[in-house]
Amino acid sequence: MLFRSDYGVPQNRERVIFIGSRDGETATFPIPKYCKDGQTLPKWRTLKDGLNGLVDAEPEYMSYSENRLKYLRLLKAGQNWRYLPEELKKEAMGGAYNSGGGKVGFYRRLSWDKPSPTITTTPHQKATDMCHPVELRCLTVRESARMQTFPDDWIFYGSVSSKYKQIGNAVPVLLAKELGIYLVNLIQGNKTQGKEIFEQLSLFSL
């Protein structure tokens, strides 16, 4: 289980990665380059870091309904539905108000100072809202691509929803690069320091 944030991706999500060895060698993974608190390594990159310098001349995004905007206008960066006035919470949440779970994604404005939540294929969905910290819209296609560490000149084809799907389903570029370089070094017999994983998940035991 690897944290994207540990490898320079400004996004907070775990990813299950399998590395197999037919020679019976201990499986290892790339050493993290960032850490959460910034004490031993550079601190995790934030949404602000990820979007720094982005020029989105023709932004593409899915629009919110006026009903959704009614509540998002009342929220600041880093807040969600729980910060709405008490008398509006139940109205805003509807049937989800009494359901279980943390529901942290409802009416969520992203925080500048933390890694982005998981980039999904539908950033405008009510339960997994990816609303910009200060603007009344979800992250644009290009902003979402930045969170997945795609280069700005990478071209996505199709409709706006198709582009979001391509981005949300992708493995973050920086994470894939770190894994690729690490595996090439292993295959070539280079002595590469790795992060040893000893835990066997019972989920995969036969």
Which residues are covered by each model-predicted region?
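C-terminal target-recognition/interaction regions appended to catalytic cores
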Residues: 66-206
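Class I S-adenosyl-L-methionine
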Residues: 1-100, 104
